[in-house]
Curated annotation (Swiss-Prot):
It comes from Rhodobacter capsulatus. GO terms for molecular function: ATP binding; proton-transporting ATP synthase activity, rotational mechanism. F-type ATPases have 2 components, CF(1) - the catalytic core - and CF(0) - the membrane proton channel. CF(1) has five subunits: alpha(3), beta(3), gamma(1), delta(1), epsilon(1). CF(0) has four main subunits: a, b, b' and c. Pfam families: ATP-synt_DE_N. HAMAP family: ATP_synth_epsil_bac (MF_00530). Keywords: ATP synthesis, CF(1), Hydrogen ion transport, Ion transport, Membrane, Transport. Belongs to the ATPase epsilon chain family. One of its GO terms (cellular component) is plasma membrane-derived chromatophore membrane. It comes from the Bacteria. Its main location: membrane. InterPro entries: ATP_synth_F1_dsu/esu, ATP_synth_F1_dsu/esu_N, ATPsynth_dsu/esu_N. This is ATP synthase epsilon chain. SUPFAM superfamilies: Epsilon subunit of F1F0-ATP synthase N-terminal domain (SSF51344). Produces ATP from ADP in the presence of a proton gradient across the membrane.
């Protein structure tokens, strides 16, 4: 079994990362998941949160607002709705993201109100996880 797996993180705007990783921690809608080389194949929906990648260069953190991840034993591919490096996630950017999530939650149809409220709570937690 290999010691690393290919990790790619892309958003509609750009490619944020492409590295050989030994571990990728993903904020899943159904719960967080750590993928390592040899992991069983899975596709998961992402919630707003911190995605952590461990590679030979060290540990890198990325903020994602949602999206999808495809995991296999050889690679992890993340398609993020919006992705930022940890350095790019400033208090001002987080406040903008929170305002947008609140606007969506306030305007949500009753059939999706719970999901919108959960997204808002996850967005608030994102800031507290990184001390914003």
């Amino acid at each position: 079994m290999a010691d690393t797996m290919q990790f790619d993180l892309v958003s509609p705007e750009r490619r944020l990362a492409s590295v050989a990783a030994s571990e990728v921690r993903l904020p899943g809608v159904e719960g967080d998941l750590t993928a390592m080389p040899g992991h069983a194949p899975v596709i998961l929906s992402l919630r707003p949160g911190i995605l952590t990648v461990v590679s030979a260069a060290g540990t890198a953190e990325y903020a994602v607002t949602g999206g999808f991840a495809e995991v296999s034993g050889e690679k992890v591919t993340v398609l993020a709705e919006r992705g930022l490096t940890r350095a790019e996630l400033t208090a001002a950017v987080h406040a903008e993201m929170l305002a947008e999530a609140k606007k969506v939650a306030d305007a949500a149809h009753p059939s999706v109100a719970d999901a919108a409220a959960k997204m808002l709570a996850d967005m608030e937690a994102l800031g507290s996880h990184i001390n914003l």
